[in-house]
């Protein structure tokens, strides 16, 4: 019986050690295999020395999925949003890759070209790259102001004498002080609105400077032929510098760095093999006693670990940094702190769901004094809770009739919740997305829009620290019994000191349709509190759209109508011809509707410097209609569909990001 047990134990020991040996060898082969595959560069067409993020058949693990190359044309080409780009050069020592558009490299007058953009996380634009914008089929008559920025493009005659093509060589967001647009940017918007389309191409700043000093179609072709520079991803450069090979994991869908195993010495391998068999023999002889000793050792270690952990939990001097941060949070925020058990009791075990926000589910609850409250329970996957801390800190500093009141919070490890006042009427979207909007008159809608403006004005200008919301939309505007609006959900709010209002975002945040253009493209400038102004303008136009839903049904199916309500301008043109925005309303209501429309349109100007600040928006809403001018029709660059689809999920599931408040505002 003893011999049988010993033999069984010996057999199990052999199997276990052999399994460890096989697993180790397979892991080494896998790591070495990817490094061997991806470490050497490859040739595609006339280009040598290509590496990540580019790849060809047989090297899928070595490149990003968006950057597969086609080598059949003799030059390496890749397709992005149906636009082909060719590689002009790749210098991984300097970290610069040069590309050019294949469709207009020889002819900038192609009628079907359109704007596309790169995944700048993988290949960011180099600092030497700027944007060249070409406007097609525009009015011939150009003002003297506009002519200082745009030059005529000599394309084959299309048969019309009053239409021309033009190009713009500089990024208007970063003009020198001597060329400030001041109040004349609407002239450029009017010019862009007169064109049938415009296409933005990255280009070398040196070539654009030459084109600007010596305008000609030949120099324009040279600027397109020279292409534009992109930088190798910083993660990849770090990987290459550390003797690794850049690649992409199909399993985790993220960048990986493959490293090779150290070369083995043959003599050393023989010694290791002998030791391997000796260890097997020794373990086989003493397996029973070793097994018993192993069990005792494991039990002893586990017991020590458990006792040590209990001591750590009970000793305040041994608490983790997370516990310290949470204690500091509770001490700094002057709000009632609830335990998770109390939250469960308040919500009656989370019985009634009243909504789902970007970071969790909202439940109805009742405090011990009988007051109804809304309890927002965050998802347990929210990392270290930075967004939660941000929300509680920002909301605890606010006190305004148009800002939702925070009553308390819960923070126990990954269990986090906020408790705020309950609104019987729910959120604004339930009114403007249903037949309820037709029962609300223009005075009520105006009161809601004005209240939201006052709330945002308070966040931007009335707090000790400027609070930027970044997710203004109907779902985040709550209505009390008197239909007075209250701005809620500060889960996306970012705080800056009053004189440091320019924000830098690592992730796009917000809700598609309400996101300002500068969040998508640096062409429009930097992200700041003016992004909230844009979202507010879209909110106001959304309210007007709900009131005029029947007149817009023919446009709502269009994707572009999500981003700009063209029907608003058509109705304004009708108003100039004697027709009001909506029939069967009084003159007073007609004036209110027009005022809301004009304010909304001013707020959604594509250039942040053309949008009014929220304190000015309140003045416009409270002022006379006669003092408001019709703003120019915005001309937005085309936003690739893929970008929009990715961004539409950001407000629902987003990682923490870093805010840099680095530019002082006088």
Swiss-Prot record:
Keyword Heme: no
Keywords linked to the UniProt accession: ATP-binding, Glycoprotein, Kinase, Membrane, Nucleotide-binding, Phosphoprotein, Receptor, Serine/threonine-protein kinase, Signal, Transferase, Transmembrane, Transmembrane helix
Pfam families xrefs: GUB_WAK_bind, PK_Tyr_Ser-Thr, WAK_assoc
Known glycosylation sites: 119, 141, 171, 198
Subcellular location, record wording: Membrane
Binding-site positions, ATP: 354-362, 376
Gene Ontology cellular component list: membrane
Topology of the protein relative to the lipid bilayer: Single-pass type I membrane protein
Similarity annotation: Belongs to the protein kinase superfamily. Ser/Thr protein kinase family.
Name recorded for this polypeptide: LEAF RUST 10 DISEASE-RESISTANCE LOCUS RECEPTOR-LIKE PROTEIN KINASE-like 2.5
Native organism: Arabidopsis thaliana (Mouse-ear cress)
Lineage: Eukaryota, Viridiplantae, Streptophyta, Embryophyta, Tracheophyta
């Amino acid at each position: 019986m003893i011999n049988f047990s010993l033999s069984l134990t010996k057999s199990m020991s052999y199997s276990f050690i052999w399994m460890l040996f096989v697993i180790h060898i397979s892991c080494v082969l896998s790591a070495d295999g990817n490094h061997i595959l991806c470490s050497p560069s490859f040739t595609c067409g006339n280009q040598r020395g290509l590496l990540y993020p580019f790849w060809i058949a047989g090297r899928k693990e070595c490149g990003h999925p968006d950057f597969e190359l086609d080598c059949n044309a003799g030059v390496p080409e890749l397709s992005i949003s149906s636009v082909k780009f060719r590689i002009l050069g790749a210098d991984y020592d300097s970290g610069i890759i040069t590309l050019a558009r294949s469709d207009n490299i020889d002819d900038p007058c192609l009628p079907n070209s359109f704007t596309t953009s790169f995944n700048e996380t993988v290949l960011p634009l180099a600092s030497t790259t700027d944007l060249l914008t070409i406007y097609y089929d525009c009015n011939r008559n150009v003002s003297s102001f506009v002519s200082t920025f745009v030059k005529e493009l000599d394309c084959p005659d299309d048969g019309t004498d009053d239409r021309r093509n033009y190009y713009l060589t500089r990024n208007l967001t970063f003009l020198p002080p001597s060329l400030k647009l001041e109040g004349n940017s609407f002239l450029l918007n009017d010019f862009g609105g007169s064109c049938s389309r415009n296409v933005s191409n990255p280009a070398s700043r040196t070539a654009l400077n030459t084109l600007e000093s010596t305008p000609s179609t030949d120099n324009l072709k040279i600027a397109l032929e020279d292409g534009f520079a992109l930088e190798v991803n910083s993660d990849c450069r770090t990987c290459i510098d550390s003797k690794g090979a850049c690649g992409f994991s199909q399993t985790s869908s993220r960048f990986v760095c493959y490293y090779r195993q150290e070369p083995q010495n043959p003599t050393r391998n023989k010694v290791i093999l002998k030791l391997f068999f000796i260890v097997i023999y020794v373990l086989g002889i003493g397996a029973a006693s070793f097994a018993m000793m192993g069990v005792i050792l494991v039990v002893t270690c586990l017991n020590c670990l458990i006792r040590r952990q209990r001591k750590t939990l009970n000793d305040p001097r041994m608490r983790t940094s997370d516990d310290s941060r949470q204690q500091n949070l509770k001490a700094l925020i002057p709000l009632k702190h609830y335990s998770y058990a109390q939250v469960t009791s308040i919500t009656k075990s989370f019985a009634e769901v009243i909504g789902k926000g970007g970071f969790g589910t909202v439940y109805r609850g009742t405090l011990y004094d009988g007051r109804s409250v809304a309890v927002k329970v965050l998802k347990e996957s929210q990392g270290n809770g930075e967004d939660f801390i941000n929300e509680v800190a920002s909301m605890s500093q606010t006190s305004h009739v148009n800002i939702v009141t925070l009553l308390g919070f819960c923070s126990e490890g990954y269990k986090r919740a906020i408790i705020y006042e309950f609104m019987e009427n729910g959120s604004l979207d339930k009114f403007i997305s249903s037949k309820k909007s037709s029962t609300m008159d223009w005075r009520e809608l105006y009161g809601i829009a004005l209240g939201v403006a006052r709330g945002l004005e308070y966040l931007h200008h009335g707090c000790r620290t400027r609070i930027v919301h970044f997710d203004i939309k109907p779902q985040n505007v709550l209505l009390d019994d008197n239909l007075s609006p209250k701005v809620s959900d500060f889960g996306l709010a970012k705080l800056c000191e009053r004189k440091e209002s320019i924000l830098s975002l690592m992730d796009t945040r917000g809700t598609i349709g309400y996101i300002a253009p500068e969040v998508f493209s640096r062409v429009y400038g930097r992200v700041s509190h003016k992004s909230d102004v844009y979202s507010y303008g879209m909110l106001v136009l959304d309210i007007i759209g709900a009131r005029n839903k029947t007149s817009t049904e023919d446009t709502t199916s269009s994707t572009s109508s999500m981003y700009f309500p063209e029907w608003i301008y058509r109705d304004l043109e009708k108003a100039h011809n004697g027709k009001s925005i909506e029939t069967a309303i009084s003159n007073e209501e007609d004036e209110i509707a027009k005022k809301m429309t004009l304010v909304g349109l001013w707020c959604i100007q594509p250039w942040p410097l053309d949008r009014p600040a929220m304190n000015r928006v309140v003045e416009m809403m409270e002022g006379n209609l006669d003092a408001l001018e019709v703003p120019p029709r915005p001309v937005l660059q085309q936003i690739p569909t893929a970008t929009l689809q990715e961004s539409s999920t950001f407000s629902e599931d987003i990682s923490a990001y870093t805010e840099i408040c680095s530019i002082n505002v006088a």
